[in-house]
Amino acid sequence: DDNPGGASGKFMNVLKGQPLCCPFGGCHELCHCCGS
């Protein structure tokens, strides 16, 4: 579900303004590039 009203949209709304570190140190639209 990529529609704004789906779970993904709500998830992005929750993380908006407070991005987290990517769990695998990679880059993603929902998290920062942390680590090496």
Curated annotation (Swiss-Prot):
Q: Where would you say this protein principally sits, based on its record?
A: secreted
Point out the coiled-coil segments of this chain: none
Q: Which cysteines are joined by disulfide bonds?
A: C21-C33, C22-C31, C27-C34
What are the subcellular locations of this protein? Answer: Secreted
Family from the record: Belongs to the conotoxin M superfamily.
User: According to its record, what is known about the domains?
Assistant: The cysteine framework is III (CC-C-C-CC).
Q: What is this protein called?
A: Conotoxin PnMLKMF-01
